[in-house]
A protein has these predicted regions:
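A conserved helix-loop-strand patch within extracytoplasmic ligand-binding domains
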Residues: 61, 89-90, 95, 102-151
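Short helices/loops that flank or line small-molecule/ion binding pockets
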Residues: 57-58, 66-67, 71-84, 98-100, ...
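Extended ligand-binding regions for polar small-molecule ligands
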Residues: 50-58, 120, 129-130, 135-138, ...
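Ligand-binding cleft/hinge of the Venus flytrap
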Residues: 38, 52-60, 139-158, 164, ...
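Ligand-binding clefts/hinges and TM-proximal coupling segments of bilobed small-molecule sensing domains
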Residues: 62, 139-155, 193-197, 228-255
Length: 255
């Protein structure tokens, strides 16, 4: 009996050691600058990527990034194509029906962006205008619930950078996007100078949830606990601030 218990203990220890050292496959959508995008030589980078690497370091795993179009993120996770999603995915009630989430690692608002010559006094004032959004995003959910119902034409895209290409081409009047993503990307680049934020910052929980977290399959309780603890650790040890300050001028962790 003692030999059996000893063997079981050794097996458990080996399994734990193996889990700690193995790769963690992380899904990203590399079209969402400055959160996830590619360098000139094709390597993934951005706030989400750096956060993922910091979390992997804390839990003694190695991040292996898997590129996935946004609307296939959760189906790919459920199909076990990767272990987690670390790609600015908001924690919403709808998503929690399918997957689990760690604690949040940032929380920033979204906002409507329109051409400067368009007068905005509320959704009704842009009836007939055409707004582009990322398919399966919280911004799409908001646009369908609050803008389309007021007569705004909502067009969904597979990637956010496709939205900006069509805005520049004159096929769209604007977008709804994360304030940091669009502010640090499209609005600050050539082609974005004729567009601006309108209306209030959008934090509506039924659309935008409670911040971005790491998505996992249900039943991965131990990994979920480890990642949430790792988020707290990098907040405490200064790694989070170093990453944050590389991309942003204020703490995006939020309230």
């Amino acid at each position: 009996m003692k030999k059996f218990l000893l063997a079981a203990a050794i097996t458990a220890m080996c399994a734990t050691a193996f889990a700690a050292g193995k790769d963690l496959k992380v899904a990203i959508d590399a079209t969402y600058e400055p959160f996830t995008f590619k360098t000139a030589d094709g390597k993934p980078t951005g706030f989400d990527v750096d956060i993922a690497n910091a979390l992997c370091e804390e839990i003694k795993r190695t991040c292996v990034f898997v590129e996935q179009p946004w609307d296939g993120m959760i189906p790919g996770l459920l199909a076990k194509k990767y272990d987690v999603i670390i790609s600015s995915m908001s924690i919403t009630e709808d998503r929690l029906k399918q997957v689990d989430f760690s604690d949040k690692y940032y929380n920033t608002p979204s906002r409507i962006v329109l051409r400067k010559d368009i007068k905005f006094s509320g959704p009704e004032s842009i009836k007939g205008k055409k707004i582009g959004v990322l398919k399966a995003s919280t911004q799409e959910k908001y646009a369908l619930g609050e803008l389309k119902t007021k007569g705004v034409e909502v067009v969904s895209y597979d990637a956010q950078d496709q939205v900006y290409l069509d805005i520049k081409a004159g096929r769209l009047d604007g977008t709804v996007a994360d304030i940091l993503e669009v502010g640090g990307g499209f609005l600050g680049k050539p082609g974005g100078e004729n567009y601006q934020f309108v209306g209030q910052e959008l934090f509506i929980p039924k659309y935008f949830g409670g911040g971005a977290g790491v998505a996992l399959r249900k039943g991965q309780g131990e990994l979920k606990t480890q990642i949430s603890a790792a988020i707290k650790a990098i907040r405490a040890n200064g790694k989070y601030k170093t990453i944050n300050d590389k991309y942003f001028k204020f703490d995006v962790y939020g309230k």
